[in-house]
Regions:
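Rossmann-fold NAD(P)-binding glycine/threonine-rich loop
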Residues: 1-22, 121-177
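Glycine-rich phosphate/diphosphate-binding loop of Rossmann-like nucleotide-binding domains
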Residues: 27-119, 128-142
Length: 181
């Protein structure tokens, strides 16, 4: 099981120990997809303080860790899922909508669900007519949102970059990288 992985070698940031550190704002090795999303906010100098974000996902891989990372940046966070009532209304109130459903047959984020100028981060991946697509109707949302990530080519590469970053960090912690040993 994942709990058998040493927390200082946990480059995915998903061991119970690292998840616990994340929930207290002290994690060093953080889950890659949420970290990649936060890195995008930093790169584009998006001030998150006081913003309202809706995360459409409650998984241990994306939704829950992302909730904690956004809280660290003083974001008001609403977590939505398959049982959430009035999802459209929640999304329409949000400055940031992050969707990670990953099943286009069950959910598509459409432009009428997003307020003008919102930021849309699409983590979902589905196959449609032999193409990879996200949860968001990209073309219509692009006309309404201030930012929207594409699928493929948006969050996915950032996830890989954060995995590499965590690998270097773990190697440094374990004194196996650049220490001459």
């Amino acid at each position: 099981t994942i709990s058998r992985i040493s927390p200082i070698k946990d480059v995915d940031g998903l061991t119970p120990y690292n998840v616990g550190l994340l929930s207290t704002g002290r994690a060093i090795l953080k889950p890659c997809t949420p970290s990649g999303i936060m890195e995008m906010f930093d790169y584009y100098n998006i001030d998150l303080t006081g913003k309202h974000a809706v995360i459409i996902n409650r998984s241990n891989l994306v939704g829950r860790p992302l909730y904690n990372l956004l809280l660290e940046k003083n974001v008001t966070v609403t977590t939505c899922h398959s049982k959430t009532q009035n999802l459209k209304e929640h999304c329409q109130k949000a400055d940031i909508v992050i969707t990670a459903v990953g099943d286009r047959t069950k959910f598509v984020l459409t432009a009428d669900m997003v307020k003008d100028g919102a930021i849309v981060i699409d983590v979902g991946i589905s196959r449609q007519d032999s193409k990879l697509v996200g949860d968001a109707d990209y073309d219509s949302i692009l006309k309404k949102a201030s930012y929207v990530t594409p699928v493929p080519g948006g969050v996915g590469p950032m996830t890989v970059a954060m995995l590499l970053k965590n690998t270097v960090t773990a190697a440094s912690i374990n004194k196996g990288f650049g220490s001459g040993s």
